[in-house]
């Protein structure tokens, strides 16, 4: 892939969306993971200024992720704010009857998105998305949480392609080497949740997207079954609510 042209196209897209909305800039959640780090880097290239990052750890968030996010803010000279959301999460735990790890992870994602939209209004800026194509196809995210945004410059790149672009843009090796994780609970791992590496997942997704029967026959049947199941079960996450026409 021509990463120079792709980078230019993404930067043009960011500039266009901000200009057409008459916004001042963008707001993003910076987790310390590779996706948000890549988007922050693209935003800085595109806009030069008015890129505001919110770092929103919980008590169990990986400290290394916060350190990496802070280093990136320093490297890019980003305006940022740290908001620890544990007290908000604790209030939910006291009131809720559903406190499974998944439920708490989803609620934490929605807390973060609420804060992002609050700051987007405060700064007259757009919330920019950080989900990649692999996550979007699988519905691997929280509806009205990390999936919510005004626009998304990286949603057409598979996770494996995110790594390639990150290397091209010389992101710090910490982002490239760390295991992918939404950091929703302690020691949470995307690939452990999904049961396969992103390399295999992306291979399967591409085969399904192009309906490459020859390639599909060579892939692990359990991988293809998992992908089809998640894509079908979570398809609603990528759609606007249906409205009855009278």
From Swiss-Prot:
Molecular function per GO: ATP binding; glutaminase activity; metal ion binding; NAD+ synthase (glutamine-hydrolyzing) activity; NAD+ synthase activity
EC number: 6.3.1.5
UniProt xrefs under Gene3D superfamilies: HUPs (3.40.50.620)
Coiled coil: none
Residues engaged in binding deamido-NAD(+): 110
GO cellular component, one term: cytoplasm
Residue numbers binding Mg(2+): 35, 135
Pathway named in the protein's UniProt entry: Cofactor biosynthesis; NAD(+) biosynthesis; NAD(+) from deamido-NAD(+) (ammonia route): step 1/1
One Pfam short name: NAD_synthase
Protein's GO biological process: NAD biosynthetic process
UniProt binding sites for ATP: 29-36, 130, 159, 181
Catalytic activity of the protein: deamido-NAD(+) + NH4(+) + ATP = AMP + diphosphate + NAD(+) + H(+)
The entry's keywords: ATP-binding, Ligase, Magnesium, Metal-binding, NAD, Nucleotide-binding
InterPro entries cross-referenced by the UniProt entry: NAD/GMP_synthase, NAD_synthase, NH(3)-dep_NAD(+)_synth, Rossmann-like_a/b/a_fold
HAMAP family: NadE_ammonia_dep
Family: Belongs to the NAD synthetase family.
Subunit structure: Homodimer.
Function as written in the Swiss-Prot or TrEMBL entry: Catalyzes the ATP-dependent amidation of deamido-NAD to form NAD. Uses ammonia as a nitrogen source.
PANTHER family xref list: GLUTAMINE-DEPENDENT NAD(+) SYNTHETASE, NH 3 /GLUTAMINE-DEPENDENT NAD + SYNTHETASE
UniProt-recorded name of the protein: NH(3)-dependent NAD(+) synthetase
Protein encoded by which gene: nadE
């Amino acid at each position: 892939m021509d990463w120079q042209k792709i980078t230019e196209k993404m930067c043009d897209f960011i500039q266009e969306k901000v200009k057409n909305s008459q916004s001042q800039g963008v707001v993003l959640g910076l987790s310390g993971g590779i996706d948000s780090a890549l988007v922050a880097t693209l935003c800085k290239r595109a806009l030069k200024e008015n890129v505001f990052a919110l770092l929103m750890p919980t008590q169990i968030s990986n400290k290394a992720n916060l350190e990496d996010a802070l280093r990136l803010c320093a490297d890019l000279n980003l305006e940022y704010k740290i908001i620890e959301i544990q007290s908000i999460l604790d209030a939910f735990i006291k009131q809720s009857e559903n406190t499974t790890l998944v439920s708490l992870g989803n609620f934490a994602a929605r807390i973060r998105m609420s804060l992002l939209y609050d700051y987007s209004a405060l700064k007259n800026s757009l919330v920019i998305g950080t989900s990649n194509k692999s996550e979007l196809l699988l519905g691997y995210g929280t509806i009205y949480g990390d999936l919510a945004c005004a626009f998304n410059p990286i949603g057409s790149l598979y996770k494996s392609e995110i790594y390639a672009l990150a290397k091209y843009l010389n992101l710090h090796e910490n982002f490239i080497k760390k295991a992918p994780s939404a950091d929703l609970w302690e020691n949470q791992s995307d690939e452990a949740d999904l049961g396969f590496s992103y390399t295999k997942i992306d291979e399967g997704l591409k085969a399904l997207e192009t309906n490459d029967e020859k390639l599909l026959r060579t892939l692990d049947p359990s991988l293809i079954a998992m992908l089809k199941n998640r894509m079908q079960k979570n398809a609603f996450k990528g759609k606007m609510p249906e409205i009855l026409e009278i």
